[in-house]
Swiss-Prot record:
Subunit structure: Component of a nucleolar TRAMP-like complex, an ATP-dependent exosome regulatory complex consisting of a helicase (MTREX), an oligadenylate polymerase (TENT4B or TENT4A), and a substrate specific RNA-binding factor (ZCCHC7 or ZCCHC8). Several TRAMP-like complexes exist with specific compositions and are associated with nuclear, or nucleolar RNA exosomes.
Organism for this UniProt entry: Mus musculus
Zn-finger (CCHC-type) residues: 236-253, 258-275, 299-316, 343-360
Protein name in the entry: Zinc finger CCHC domain-containing protein 7
Keywords recorded for this protein, A-Z: Isopeptide bond, Metal-binding, Nucleus, Phosphoprotein, Repeat, Ubl conjugation, Zinc, Zinc-finger
Length: 541
């Protein structure tokens, strides 16, 4: 078929008088020319310089004859011509950190196959020539943009089959400008100068002057003792030791134990406090506590019309004393205070309503909201009626045994004792300056002597004593009571009278104890007393 030649390659070698055999694979020189056209640039300015350098190299390289009108054509082989549009752009690559990053890519390639005369150079070697347009850039194009040149080689059917087999082994990550892969997220792009900072907002951040003066760092330390050696010049105060120069988290002293908000004692919190009170009856909760009050959410106040309490426990009772400075009924304002124009809610922070009127969910559900207004002021009669109701309630609690016991608070009792002791010292010389106190023994002796004097003055005749050994007649007792008191009692002060009456009551209370011990021999004593007082009658009578 080929005129005695075995293959078409041998026929072509004899036809073109070429000693070298035709090869399907790409020649090493062609591969070198292809790789030499890949440009690397760190920034746009460097890319422009390299573009001019490449133009000089292309002029000195081997050239292939082409038509004068085809300025933007690249001859790849004897029968292949590829035309590139002027709007195409080149991929810019950064070789600084061996990381390739694509800036822009807009490719519009139009392939046109044209035949040429067979009087060309060798078919096995592909000649390549770069011709660039040296004209000024069009207004549509931006200055300093690097174009992308993609070189495509079209060969025969056998060569196409070989290239397709080679392309099957090429993966997506090997191609420049391909789609993003999930494995590429681990690559760190350390490029400086390639991107513009035009998209960032021009925001000026600054540090407050107070933070600078206090010299407080925003970086938290990993351990507690890292900042142990602090400087005293810092304007901060520790809440643990009350010393300046460091914070409580860096304090070398042990942390204080939190105090209870109910009894102000340390060692327990609110939920474990022994003085914890019941939310329904407001009494301390003990082990045997029994609450007979209605549940708090079923109570409604007749005074402020709020849920959670009764009228006697309404917070308006103490709120009405906002103008009172003297003891007595609360003072009323001359003109009623109107509602302010600016109204905000403490629960939802919205404008237009108060916190007790808010319908949103409460931040703290343990208490019920109360009204901040005062609807009425109490008078003397209202205060007296409320005190009577409270006393009646206390009596009922004492009867049932539900009255709260007093909890011992050592630090409070010590302060109270000191205050009372100081008050006694200060008041004793003024109160008892004229009438100093006497001992109990001297007081008892005086009372006995006075009782003896009154008994002698009201002494009955001997006959009456005989007839009435256990006591005198009622008339005699009446005479004794009608006697005038001694002069000393008239001259005594009112204070001495009260003191004497009190001592007499104490002596009367102590006498029955002695009588109980002598009840057994009372009859014998009376018989002996009667015989002793009995005297022999005169015989003449």
């Amino acid at each position: 078929m080929f005129g005695g030649y075995e293959t078409i390659e041998a026929f072509e070698d004899d036809l073109y008088r070429d000693d070298s055999s035709s090869e399907l694979s790409v020649d090493s020189e062609v591969e070198f020319q292809l790789y030499s056209q890949v440009h690397y640039a760190q920034s746009i300015h460097n890319a422009n310089k390299e573009e001019g350098y490449e133009e000089k190299n292309c002029e000195n390289s081997e050239t292939v004859s082409s038509q004068p009108n085809q300025k933007n054509l690249i001859v790849l082989s004897d029968s292949e011509v590829i035309q590139l549009s002027d709007t195409s752009e080149v991929i810019t690559l950064s070789d600084e950190d061996s990381i390739y990053r694509c800036k822009r890519k807009n490719i519009e390639v139009q392939a046109e196959e044209k035949t040429q005369s067979p009087a060309t150079s060798h078919s096995n070697k592909v000649a390549q020539k770069c011709k660039r347009n040296n004209k000024k850039p069009k207004p549509e194009e931006r200055p300093g943009v690097i174009r992308e040149v993609m070189i495509i080689e079209v060969s025969s059917n056998e060569e196409e089959e070989s290239t397709t087999s080679e392309n099957e082994n090429v993966e997506s990550w090997m191609l420049l400008g391909s789609e993003e892969d999930g494995k590429d997220n681990d690559i760190l792009l350390n490029l400086v100068g390639c991107e513009t900072a035009g998209a960032e907002d021009d925001v000026n951040w600054f540090i407050s002057d107070k933070d600078i003066e206090a010299k407080i760092d925003n970086n938290r330390s990993s351990g507690r003792w890292n900042n142990r050696y602090y400087s005293v010049n810092k304007n901060v105060t520790c809440r643990n030791c009350d010393k300046r120069g460091h914070l409580s988290k860096n304090c070398p002293l042990p942390q204080k134990v939190r105090a209870c908000c109910l009894c102000s004692e340390r060692g327990h919190l609110q939920y474990g406090c022994p003085a914890r009170y019941c939310l329904d009856c407001s009494l301390p909760m003990s082990s045997n506590h029994r609450c007979f009050e209605r549940l708090s959410w079923r109570k409604r106040c007749d005074r402020c019309d709020m849920i959670g309490h009764h009228a006697d426990a309404c917070p308006e009772i103490w709120r009405q004393y906002h103008l009172t400075t003297k003891p007595g009924p609360p003072k009323k304002p001359k003109t009623p205070s109107g509602q302010s124009a600016l109204v905000y809610c403490y629960n939802c922070a919205q404008k237009g309503h108060y916190g007790h009127e808010c319908t949103e969910r409460r931040m703290f559900n343990q208490t019920f909201p109360t009204s901040p207004f005062i609807y009425c002021y109490d008078g003397k009669y209202d205060i007296q009626q409320r005190d009577r109701r409270i006393k009646r309630k206390v009596k009922d609690l004492k009867k049932n045994g539900d009255f709260p016991r007093q909890f011992k608070r050592p630090h409070v009792e010590e302060t109270d004792k000191r205050r009372h002791h100081d008050m006694r010292k200060s008041r004793s010389p003024r109160k008892y300056r004229r009438w100093p106190r006497e001992n109990k023994e001297t007081q008892k002796e005086k009372t006995r002597s006075r009782e003896g004097k009154t008994h002698r003055r009201g002494h009955q005749p001997r006959g009456e004593d005989e007839d009435f050994p256990r006591g005198s007649k009622p008339n005699a007792s009446g005479c004794a009571n009608n006697q005038k008191p001694s002069k000393s009692l008239h001259h005594a002060s009112h204070y001495h009278r009260l003191r004497e009456e009190r001592l007499l009551r104490e002596s009367k209370r102590s006498k029955p104890k002695k009588r109980k011990s002598t009840e057994d021999g009372s009859h014998d004593d009376l018989f002996l007393i009667k015989q002793k007082k009995k005297k022999p009658k005169p015989s003449g009578l």
